[in-house]
Amino acid sequence: PLDYANLGVRSLRLSEIRTTQFAAAMRMQPDLFSIFGGPNDMLSVTCDFAGIRADLAAIFGDARSPDCTVVTFTMPDPSSINPFGRRFRNRMLHFNDIIREESERYGVLVMDFQHYPIIQDPRLFSEDRLHGNQLGHERVAAAMAWRLGIEGADESWAEPFPDAPPRLRSREQLAADVEWARRYFAPWLGRGIRRTPHGSGLTAKRPVLTPVPKHQS
């Protein structure tokens, strides 16, 4: 039998994940603990890498035990996904280095997505160009299963699509980027200016352990 919980809430910084979600997760006494946070820190005006490393180390150190496997992952290069990706590229790659270093120190499994070109394919992302769509989640789930060594999982998730992503003409791409900025970036920026928490009003989808039917596992 498999019991599953998902405490994730969009838009939280890593320190907020540590203070608002981590203790609840540990009270569930998981034997498999998946943790990821940090990209929202990368998108902030300032980025406290020392604080991020400390939070990550604390989470890894407290979660890792002989009875609990901890798994995390790195981020893909954002420059091909998001109009502002190049601005945050160096931050994201440095963050990936921190993930690798702290994971090695605490014996945490890492799915290193930075080294897999398929994860940079824009067709795996939702319209906000930040979060994965259904296809993206399917690829990530298959990758994590492979990294965990689950029976029947293989590396086929990393195979590229048979065709290249559609390329828009310059004018069409500009129009698409402007529309993206209007629908997603401007509201995000507005919340930041008003100092409204980006995760305000959002809750976890599965905050308690729930049995997963065999056909869904």
Q: Which ranges hold each PLM region?
A:
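Alpha-helix N-cap and loop-to-helix initiation/capping positions
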Residues: 17, 47-54, 86-94, 128-136
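Alpha-helical scaffolding segments of alpha/beta enzyme cores, especially the outer helices
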Residues: 51-65, 90, 94-101
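Conserved catalytic region of serine esterases and O-acyltransferases that act on ester linkages
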Residues: 101, 105, 128-131, 135-217
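A short helix->loop->beta-strand "cap" motif at the edges of active sites that frequently abuts
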Residues: 61-71, 108
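Serine-dependent acyl-ester chemistry module
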Residues: 39-50, 77-94, 217
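Ligand-binding pocket scaffold of soluble enzyme catalytic domains
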Residues: 6, 35-36, 71-73, 95, ...
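Conserved SGNH/GDSL esterase-like catalytic core that processes O-acyl groups on lipids
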Residues: 1-57, 171-215
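Substrate-gating cap/lid alpha-helix
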Residues: 80-113, 134-138
